[in-house]
């Protein structure tokens, strides 16, 4: 897709926003994958393993991440279509008649991309390390090169079709891994699995009061709420604004916000990431050899290596 985009897109609009031609279905999947990404696959179950169901309530970010898109995305698309904006810097500089804002948007985009990409690459590196035995740094660098290649050569169109595959792997992987963990012989099915969870220390099962540190660690109700509010920035980021500029029509916006993010990803997170995190905690406390030295970054890779069939 990177090479295809390189040979077919000859304008700045074609490269940066796919010529405003991203189709309905592709946007649904790719934008949802971009909203959640590798952190949800690797880090989310890892924090459930570490802090228990107190953190699992943060899965409600499937509601808060699309909220900013609900408020602003359609208006952003209309302005981009009407005035021909290609980047968010174009939009803000024109709207406020101030070129300084263009550079502020660029700085925001660079800082956002550096740290957000670093989280994803760290997750990928941890996965490579456990599954393939490749050092974490080498795995992260290898993935960074692949991303750099298809983004630089193919632009947003290449990123979109890669995002479609990423969505299938993300949601499908979470559900499949959670299912295999729950049905593993070590647990003996749903009844035995739920009984094992009930036997855990209460700090892994209860959410603290509004502000009451200790039980459940730092994940108090207020902490969970502010954490979810912080994630609202994803769909208001400069990168996501360019996704919005790139679609053919605003029709997929509501479907992405209400159905794909909230229902589809929510189904995977509320159930199957909890199965993964709590299952790993049970096995660790039971003295399972594979989970003796796991940490937040390696919980999911170890689960994959232990429970998934070889062909996966």
Mark where each language-model region is.
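Hydrophobic alpha-helical transmembrane segments
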Residues: 1-16, 51-57, 87-91, 111-117, ...
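Residue-level recognition of pore/gate-forming positions within transmembrane alpha-helices
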Residues: 34-35, 62-66, 109-110, 144-148, ...
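Loop-to-helix junctions at membrane interfaces in multi-pass transport proteins
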Residues: 19-22, 43-50, 54-58, 93, ...
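Membrane-interface "cap" regions at the ends of multi-pass membrane proteins
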Residues: 1-42, 154, 173
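Structural signature of transmembrane alpha-helix termini at the membrane-water interface
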Residues: 1-7, 67-75, 118-125, 149-156, ...
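Transmembrane-helix boundary/entry motifs in multi-pass membrane transporters
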Residues: 15-33, 79-114, 248-251, 255-264, ...
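Helix-loop-helix module between adjacent transmembrane segments
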Residues: 56-151, 226-233
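Membrane-water interface regions at transmembrane-helix termini and the short interhelical loops
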Residues: 2, 47-51, 75-79, 123-131, ...
């Amino acid at each position: 897709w990177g090479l295809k985009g390189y040979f077919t897109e000859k304008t700045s609009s074609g490269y940066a926003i796919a010529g405003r031609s991203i189709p309905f279905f592709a946007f649904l999947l790719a934008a949802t994958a971009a909203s959640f990404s590798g952190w949800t696959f690797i880090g989310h179950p890892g924090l459930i393993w570490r802090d228990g169901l107190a953190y699992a309530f943060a899965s409600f970010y499937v509601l808060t991440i699309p909220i900013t898109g609900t408020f602003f995305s359609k208006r952003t698309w209309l302005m981009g279509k009407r005035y021909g904006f290609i980047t968010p810097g174009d939009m803000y500089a024109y709207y406020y008649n101030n070129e300084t804002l263009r550079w502020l948007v660029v700085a925001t985009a660079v800082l956002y991309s550096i740290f957000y990409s670093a989280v994803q690459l760290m997750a990928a590196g941890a996965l490579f390390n456990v599954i393939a035995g490749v050092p974490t740094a080498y795995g992260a660098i290898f993935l960074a090169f692949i991303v750099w290649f298809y983004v630089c050569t193919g632009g947003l169109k290449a990123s979109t079709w890669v995002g479609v595959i990423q969505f299938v792997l993300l949601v499908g992987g979470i559900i499949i891994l959670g299912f295999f963990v729950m049905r593993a012989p070590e647990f003996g099915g749903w009844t035995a699995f739920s009984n094992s969870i009930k036997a855990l220390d209460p700090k892994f099962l209860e959410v603290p009061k509004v502000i009451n540190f200790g039980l459940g660690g730092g994940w108090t109700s207020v902490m969970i709420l502010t954490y979810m509010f912080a994630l609202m920035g994803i769909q208001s980021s400069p990168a996501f604004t360019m996704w919005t500029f790139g679609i053919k029509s605003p029709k997929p916006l509501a479907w992405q916000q209400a159905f794909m993010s909230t229902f589809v990803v929510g189904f995977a997170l509320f159930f199957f990431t909890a199965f993964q995190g709590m299952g790993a905690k049970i096995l660790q406390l039971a003295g399972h050899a594979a989970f003796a030295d796991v940490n937040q970054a390696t919980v999911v890779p170890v689960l994959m290596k232990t429970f998934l069939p070889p062909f996966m």
